[in-house]
Amino acid sequence: MDLPGLIHDFLLVFLGLGLILGGLGVVLLTNPIYSAFSLGLVLVCISLFYILSNSHFVAAAQLLIYVGAINVLIIFAVMFMNGSEYYKDFNLWTVGSGVTSLVCTSIFVSLITIIPDTSWYGIIWTTKTNQIIEQDLISNGQQIGIHLSTDFFLPFEFISIILLVALIGAIAVARQ
C-alpha cells in the first residue's frame, strides 16, 4: 500500500504485536479452541503484512487457504475431541517442555543476533536489464509460479514436507 511513513510504521508495529500475542496465545492457552482462534489471528496478521507489502494475491491466498480452510478444519477437529479426556492428565510444565523452550529460545536469540549483521544488499534477484523488462511483461501469478518452481523450489518442498508431517501428526493425535 502507498501509505505515509508514520501510518505504515504504526501498522507494522500493530501487526507485529498481533503476531506476537497470537503466537503466545497459540502456545500458552490451554483450551484448544482458544489456541485455534489465536492461530487464526496470527494468520490474518500475516495476510495483512502481505497487503502492506503490495502482495495482494498472496494475501488473498493466505486468507482463503489458511484462515478459511486450514484453521476452520482445526477448529472443526478440536470440537469433535472429547474435552474431558484432554484435561485429565494435563501437566503445565514437563521436562520436554523445558528442553523445547530452551531450544526455541536459543534459536530465537541466535536469529536476533544474526539478522541485523547480515548484508542484505548482496542478494540480487535480477542482474540483467533484459530480465527486468521480461519480468514486467509477466503477471504476478506467473511470477509467483516461476519463483516457486525455480528460485524457491527447495524451501517450497521443505514447507510441504513439514505440513505433511504436521497433518500426519494431527491425524495420529486425533485417533488416540
UniProtKB/Swiss-Prot annotation:
Task: Give membrane topology per the record.
Answer: Multi-pass membrane protein
Q: Which UniProt keywords apply?
A: Chloroplast, Membrane, NAD, NADP, Plastid, Plastoquinone, Quinone, Thylakoid, Translocase, Transmembrane, Transmembrane helix, Transport
Question: The organism sits in which domain of life?
Answer: Eukaryota
Which subcellular locations apply to this protein?
Answer: Plastid, Chloroplast thylakoid membrane
As its record notes, the protein acts as a catalyst of:
a plastoquinone + NADH + (n+1) H(+)(in) = a plastoquinol + NAD(+) + n H(+)(out); a plastoquinone + NADPH + (n+1) H(+)(in) = a plastoquinol + NADP(+) + n H(+)(out)
Q: Name one GO cellular component term.
A: chloroplast thylakoid membrane
EC number of the protein: 7.1.1.-
Q: Which residues cross the membrane?
A: 10-30, 32-52, 61-81, 95-115, 152-172
Chief localization class?
plastid
- One Pfam match, given by its short name, reads Oxidored_q3
A GO molecular function term, named singly, is: quinone binding
| Subunit and partners | NDH is composed of at least 16 different subunits, 5 of which are encoded in the nucleus.
The UniProt family comment states: Belongs to the complex I subunit 6 family.
The UniProt function text for this chain reads:
NDH shuttles electrons from NAD(P)H:plastoquinone, via FMN and iron-sulfur (Fe-S) centers, to quinones in the photosynthetic chain and possibly in a chloroplast respiratory chain. The immediate electron acceptor for the enzyme in this species is believed to be plastoquinone. Couples the redox reaction to proton translocation, and thus conserves the redox energy in a proton gradient.
Official protein name in the record = NAD(P)H-quinone oxidoreductase subunit 6, chloroplastic
Q: Which organism is it from?
A: Manihot esculenta (Cassava)
Gene transcribed to yield this protein:
ndhG
